[in-house]
Amino acid sequence: MESTGSVGEAPGGPRVLVVGGGIAGLGAAQRLCGHSAFPHLRVLEATARAGGRIRSERCFGGVVEVGAHWIHGPSRGNPVFQLAAEYGLLGEKELSQENQLVETGGHVGLPSVSYASSGASVSLQLVAEMATLFYGLIDQTREFLHAAETPVPSVGEYLKKEIGQHVAGWTEDEETRKLKLAVLNSFFNLECCVSGTHSMDLVALAPFGEYTVLPGLDCTFSKGYQGLTNCMMAALPEDTVVFEKPVKTIHWNGSFQEAAFPGETFPVSVECEDGDRFPAHHVIVTVPLGFLREHLDTFFDPPLPAEKAEAIRKIGFGTNNKIFLEFEEPFWEPDCQLIQLVWEDTSPLEDAAPELQDAWFRKLIGFVVLPAFASVHVLCGFIAGLESEFMETLSDEEVLLCLTQVLRRVTGNPRLPAPKSVLRSRWHSAPYTRGSYSYVAVGSTGGDLDLLAQPLPADGAGAQLQILFAGEATHRTFYSTTHGALLSGWREADRLLSLWAPQVQQPRPRL
């Protein structure tokens, strides 16, 4: 059904629907609800909770982050940091000027201890030497940002090519050379977690430097990241968010009539899985890219323009999971913050097919030591890619047994007490997420993220701004982050404000 070319009279203001109650959706809703031009706004959330990929759970006697973990770049230019500060969710250290001025370059700090698969500890001096090499090469990738062409398509291939040249100049014995390569391989696995990808060979080289790192030493929320989205929820009028309301299809570019609104026509009608329909003048879609890709053929009617659909298929979207292990007593030192795992028979210069069944755990980068809860000690492991997705298919008992064996092996202590319990994220299996976050894949560019962010209809035919797009995968320089997601929600809210705000008394948008 063709759109009438106008949103009609819209008595009392436009009807706006936000699909998805993550930080992008809540950010858009909060921005619009604060304005008198938008009295009719609903957020449709598929699950029973708000927050999306921000998910804090009470466990082990404290709070753990099943989803987003850190504020990346907590400084004045970061809206998540600013909002958290306004809500009083951060401590004195996190708010300190000193913390905000730290330049990390986006790189993870050095491990406190590095365990090798033979049961020996790796020299931290050797680890630091390899970290300097690896992150120096990562920084070098920025040279290709505006280059007409790149020597190889991917970040992984570039790193391996450069490392190969360095290896040729190494003068140590064979055993030390192999250990250096194994340590480098663990940094590759870590970078896969950072980028949310199975392999750095999948990450495009040219646009890699477009991702922008903000100053500030990454920090956490002592009482849980979800405290932020809870505060945002509390700022919305009651019943704005409708829970357990998954959307099936967004029908757009039409002239839809609803019995509840006699005499009105709407360019969009949102059909939910339970059969309910919501008419709207504007819909802000904030669902994760993984979900969008899986349901691309049925989520929009008519289908998305070919160019936008192609961008959705090309942008990368992978899995990074966490495995929490609870211990009665710590086997690590009191000042330990990060435990690195190094598999001595691995090398980034050797392409090995993933052995999911027997060796999925070798992709695990190690463990972050969480702040001790009341007499409880917890490690948080990170694992990305196909191995991470395979881990989701295992039982808790299988994961616990496997990682107990790994820890006994690398510490050289066959009597190391097994963890008391395990908790895992399963972002790939989550039906409304289907992964963790986006990256710019080989074959795509930052332009694809901009293309995904463009509202529909794109040609100006029909009512304006029927479908708008937000979420971390729509932010060209802050993709994969909560601050990118929040900014994208604000961006789309501002599009509607610029259309409607001057029309508060005469609610008809400029056409």
From Swiss-Prot:
**Tissues with expression:** Widely expressed. Not detected in spleen. Expressed at lower level in neoplastic tissues.
- Predominant place of localization: other
Keywords associated with the record: Acetylation, Cytoplasm, FAD, Flavoprotein, Oxidoreductase, Peroxisome
**Record: residues binding FAD:** A24, E45, R53, H69, W70, V247, E472, T481, T482
Kindly tell me the pathway this chain contributes to.
Amine and polyamine metabolism; spermine metabolism
Q: Which GO terms describe its biological process?
A: polyamine catabolic process; positive regulation of spermidine biosynthetic process; putrescine biosynthetic process; putrescine catabolic process; spermidine catabolic process; spermine catabolic process
The reactions it catalyses are: N(1)-acetylspermine + O2 + H2O = 3-acetamidopropanal + spermidine + H2O2; N(1)-acetylspermidine + O2 + H2O = 3-acetamidopropanal + putrescine + H2O2; N(1),N(12)-diacetylspermine + O2 + H2O = 3-acetamidopropanal + N(1)-acetylspermidine + H2O2
Q: Which cofactor does it need?
A: FAD
Positions carrying N-acetylmethionine: M1
List the PANTHER family hit by this protein, alphabetically.
FLAVIN MONOAMINE OXIDASE (PTHR10742), PEROXISOMAL N(1)-ACETYL-SPERMINE_SPERMIDINE OXIDASE (PTHR10742:SF405)
- The protein depicted here goes by the name Peroxisomal N(1)-acetyl-spermine/spermidine oxidase
Organism equals Homo sapiens
